[in-house]
C-alpha cells in the first residue's frame, strides 16, 4: 500500500514514478485508482499529478475518499476525481426510506448553481456499490428499485461506475466478509437489468448534458425525483419513480415536447407526465 511507504524519501518517490511510467509505456494505461487517497501526503499527490499531466494528456488519477471536503484531494494539484461516498449513502438510503429529499439535497449541495455548492463542474466517481461495501441488490429492501436506482446513478452528475456482477443483480453482504463481495465469475448472467444498464450507459455517453451538465431540482417528492441537467444548449430531464404505483407529475418542463433518451419515443408534457411504476 502506497500510504505505508515513506513518500518524503526521493528514492521511494522515484521508484513509484518509474513504475507509473513503465505501466504507461508497456500497457498504455489510462489512469490510476489511488487506494486510501485521503491518507496520502498532499505534496506527493501534487508531484504524482504533475507526472500524470506530463506523460499522457488524458491520464486520470481517481482517489478513494470517504468523508470531508473532497476538494482537498480533487483539484489541479491532486486527483482529477474522487469517490463520492456521500451520494453513495444517499442513493440507497433514499430508496430504502422512501425519502428522495435526502439524495436531492446531497446532489444540489454538491453540484447545484448556488455559490455555496461544493463541486459544481467537477466529476466525482459515482457508484451504488463496490468491492468494499454490500452489493446494492442486497442492501435494497425492495429489489424492484434496482432499475430506478441505476437510472439515478446514470442521470446524476458524476462518472457512473458499475461493479462487476451487479449489472445482473449479484448479491453479497459485507458482514460475511470480503470474499462474498469479490467472487470469481465464470460467465455473465445477462438479464433485463443488464439490458437496462446498457441502455442507460448508451444514453449517458451520447448526452453532453448528462456527461457534464449542470444540476437543478425540478420536483421532489418522497418517492419521486425530477431534475434537470443542462450543457451546451442541451437539456435533459431525469425522472425517477421509486414506487410500485404510477405517479402523475405536474411541473414546468420548460417545453411542450421532448424525446425519451432510452426509447427514442416522443414525449408530450401537456396535461402532466405519468411516471411509470418501476
Q: Whereabouts are the PLM-identified features?
A:
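Carbohydrate-interacting/catalytic domains
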Residues: 143-147, 157, 162, 166-278
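Structural preference for beta-strand elements that scaffold enzyme active sites
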Residues: 29-33, 58-62, 123-126, 160-161
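Alpha-helical scaffold elements lining the catalytic groove of polysaccharide deacetylases
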Residues: 8-15
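Active-site-proximal helices and loops of the catalytic beta/alpha 8
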Residues: 35-119, 152, 169-199, 203, ...
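Conserved, mostly hydrophobic/aromatic
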Residues: 16, 23, 34, 61, ...
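Active-site clefts of carbohydrate-active enzymes
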Residues: 118-141
Amino acid at each position: 500500500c502506497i500510504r505505508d511507504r515513506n513518500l518524503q524519501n526521493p528514492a521511494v518517490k522515484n521508484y513509484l514514478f518509474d513504475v507509473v511510467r513503465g505501466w504507461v509505456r508497456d500497457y498504455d494505461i489510462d489512469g490510476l485508482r489511488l487506494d486510501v487517497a485521503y491518507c496520502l501526503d498532499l505534496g506527493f499527490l501534487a508531484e504524482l499529478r504533475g507526472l500524470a499531466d506530463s506523460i499522457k494528456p488524458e491520464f486520470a488519477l481517481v482517489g478513494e475518499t470517504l468523508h470531508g471536503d473532497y476538494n482537498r484531494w480533487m483539484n489541479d494539484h491532486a486527483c482529477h476525481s474522487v469517490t463520492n461516498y456521500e451520494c453513495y449513502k444517499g442513493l440507497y438510503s433514499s430508496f430504502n426510506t422512501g425519502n428522495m429529499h435526502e439524495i436531492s439535497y446531497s446532489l444540489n449541495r454538491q453540484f447545484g448553481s448556488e455559490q455555496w455548492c461544493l463541486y459544481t463542474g467537477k466529476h466525482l466517481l459515482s457508484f451504488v456499490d463496490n468491492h468494499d461495501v454490500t452489493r446494492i441488490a442486497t442492501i435494497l429492501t425492495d429489489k424492484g428499485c434496482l432499475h430506478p436506482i441505476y437510472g439515478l446513478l446514470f442521470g446524476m452528475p458524476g462518472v457512473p461506475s458499475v461493479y462487476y456482477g451487479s449489472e445482473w443483480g449479484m448479491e453479497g453482504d459485507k458482514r460475511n466478509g470480503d470474499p462474498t463481495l469479490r467472487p470469481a465469475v465464470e460467465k455473465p448472467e445477462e438479464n433485463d437489468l443488464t439490458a437496462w444498464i446498457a441502455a442507460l450507459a448508451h444514453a449517458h455517453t451520447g448526452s453532453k448534458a448528462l456527461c457534464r451538465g449542470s444540476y437543478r431540482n425540478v420536483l421532489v417528492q418522497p418517492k419521486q425525483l425530477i431534475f434537470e441537467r443542462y450543457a451546451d444548449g442541451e437539456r435533459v430531464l431525469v425522472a425517477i419513480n421509486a414506487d410500485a404505483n404510477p405517479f402523475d407529475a405536474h411541473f414546468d418542463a420548460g417545453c411542450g415536447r421532448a424525446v425519451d433518451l432510452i426509447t427514442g419515443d416522443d414525449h408530450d408534457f401537456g396535461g402532466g407526465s405519468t411516471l411509470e411504476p418501476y
